[in-house]
Regions:
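GIY-YIG nuclease catalytic motif and its immediate N-terminal context
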Residues: 1-57, 61-71, 78-85, 102-104, ...
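Short arginine-rich
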Residues: 62, 85-98
Length: 127
């Protein structure tokens, strides 16, 4: 089995300009690691939020795939769709190996994306 390639970008950026927009292939998994869903999107932040809040019908919701464990960034949606199809055709072991290239502990890569940060008060105390 060939080793999957490591992605070039490990943190998503969501540019405001339409021409600068990226596409993403991502994997969300359940906390038990039993379920793993692969998808494609033009807005990774929004899509991850939808998965975390069970706003998406289907496999990911049914199996509680709330943790972003992997993603790749593409300039063209056609490339992202082709990559999604490629990954979906793999056996589970190969998908696991791909995740573990950048995320060996399978931590939620988006765990800090949706937190509200409180400003530090005058005394330096953070509420």
């Amino acid at each position: 089995m060939p080793v999957p390639r490591k992605p070039l970008v490990t943190r998503p950026e969501q540019p405001s300009g339409l021409l600068d927009r990226y596409s993403y292939v991502y994997m969300v998994g359940s906390s038990s690691r039993r379920a793993l869903y692969t998808g494609v999107t033009a807005n990774l932040n929004k899509r991850v939020y939808e998965h975390k809040n069970d706003l998406v019908e289907g496999f990911a919701r049914k199996y509680k795939c709330h943790r972003l464990v992997y993603f790749e960034t593409f300039e063209h949606i056609s490339d992202a769709i082709a990559r999604e199809k490629e990954i979906k055709g793999w056996r589970r072991e190969k998908k696991n190996a791909l995740v573990e290239l950048i995320n060996p502990r399978w931590k939620d890569l988006s765990e800090d994306w949706f937190r509200v940060r409180m400003p530090t008060g005058p005394s330096g105390f953070e509420p």
